[in-house]
């Protein structure tokens, strides 16, 4: 059997984490959740066939993709996907896949839409991640990307005031914690263009992500203000979070009938089957259990 490749960049795994509850449900993040929902509603197409949700976690955003016939929830953490399945159920509309963004287990050109929310900031090689995403998208597919903005107002003021060493205006990414990165907007735009994406719209999101404001001002007021300011992302991005709607350019090979998955090691096509599969190309076995497809490449012994 061919040994799995270990050449991909490091992965930030939320395996065993109670992130959904501790961060979103009890972590006073109602403001962030609400303004991200507004941004998604503004950027998503009204309808589609098959959406790939990259970094789906426990399925916080998944119900917001109601315009798509089917949604593939992809995350590296199997325990996060188990939480998502518990929340969303086992309806055929949702497909749960444990996999690495750098090694997506799908045939080329499969999806007509994709989202990557609060996920790129864990990528040491964002260009490689975007290249992987583009491969599995059909021509003219819509890609909604969110990234943590290095050039946010707080970082700018701290830098100008001498309280921060790193420069928010320089193009390189900054790792503010292990496997947590902020990116410069120009760098992200360049990487999207290099990987055959055309930006159609940009939104500046979470301008009011300030502890004092969230404690002292009504949630509805903050959400309304953020909603009113999101359009400014069209010409300037100084918010903590930036949302981009991009379109996949260039021809993509047609998907063969019956093809869905692809081996992440050798890229041999695999059927969409609710059972474990042995790759006909390299012999690797990919597990299916508890409603979750597991295509994570295991380190060589």
Regions found by a protein language model. Name each.
Residues 1-47, 60-61, 80-83, 143-168, 297-301:
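Conserved class I S-adenosyl-L-methionine
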Residues 115:
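A conserved beta-strand element that flanks and buttresses the S-adenosyl-L-methionine
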Residues 127-142:
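A short glycine-rich, Lys/Arg-flanked "PGG" loop and its adjoining helix->strand segment in the class I
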Residues 162-165, 190, 201-269, 273:
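A C-terminal cap/extension of S-adenosyl-L-methionine-dependent methyltransferases
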Residues 166-187:
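Acceptor-substrate binding/catalytic loop of class I
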């Amino acid at each position: 059997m061919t040994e799995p490749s270990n050449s991909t960049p490091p992965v930030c795994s939320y395996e065993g984490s109670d992130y959904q509850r501790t961060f979103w449900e009890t972590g006073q993040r109602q403001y962030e959740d609400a303004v991200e929902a507004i941004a998604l509603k503004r950027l998503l197409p009204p309808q589609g066939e098959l959406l790939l949700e990259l970094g789906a976690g426990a399925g916080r955003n998944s119900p917001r993709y109601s315009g798509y016939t089917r949604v593939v929830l992809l995350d590296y953490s199997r325990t996060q996907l188990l939480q998502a399945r518990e929340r969303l159920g086992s309806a055929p509309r949702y497909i749960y896949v444990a996999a690495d963004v750098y090694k997506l287990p799908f045939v080329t050109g499969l999806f007509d839409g994709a989202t990557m929310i609060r996920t790129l900031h864990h990528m040491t090689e964002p260009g490689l991640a975007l290249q992987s995403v583009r491969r599995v998208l059909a021509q003219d597919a819509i890609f909604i990307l969110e990234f943590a903005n290095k050039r946010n107002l707080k970082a700018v003021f701290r830098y100008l005031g001498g309280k921060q060493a790193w420069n928010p205006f320089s193009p390189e990414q900054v790792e503010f914690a292990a496997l947590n990165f902020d990116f410069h907007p120009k760098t992200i735009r360049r990487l999207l263009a290099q990987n055959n994406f055309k930006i159609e719209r940009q939104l500046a999101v979470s301008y009011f992500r300030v502890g004092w404001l969230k404690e002292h001002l009504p949630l509805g007021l903050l959400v309304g203000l953020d909603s009113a300011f999101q359009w400014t992302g069209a010409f300037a991005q100084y918010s903590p979070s930036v949302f981009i709607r991009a379109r996949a350019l260039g021809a993509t090979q047609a998907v063969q009938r019956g093809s869905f998955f692809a081996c992440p090691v050798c890229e041999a096509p695999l059927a969409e089957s609710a059972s474990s599969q042995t790759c006909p190309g390299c012999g690797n076995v990919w597990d299916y259990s508890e409603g979750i497809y597991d295509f994570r490449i295991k380190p060589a012994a």
